[in-house]
């Protein structure tokens, strides 16, 4: 994988990947917030892909993270609690299996921090 950023001025960067590009607005969102959203976005898409592979649709879906950081610089992540909230016609066992597979195997970003960050999660499926 190769990625790059180009400074555009005014604390904005153009982020480039082989597939696409997008603007990082560090005046509004910190790099740490981009990092955190990348982590939950990675595990979030895994649930959708696994459910679709099994013929299920996921709707009304959001993923949130509550993150605690250390007090001393560089203020690393100490813990991350991820909340998956969605509707889907598959049972709770499948939902837990999909999310567990993502967090323990498939999601590169989560697994890159797993050794140093306590990761936990909650599933809210169909309002329960």
What is each model feature region?
Residues 1-37, 48-128:
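Extended beta-strand/beta-hairpin segments
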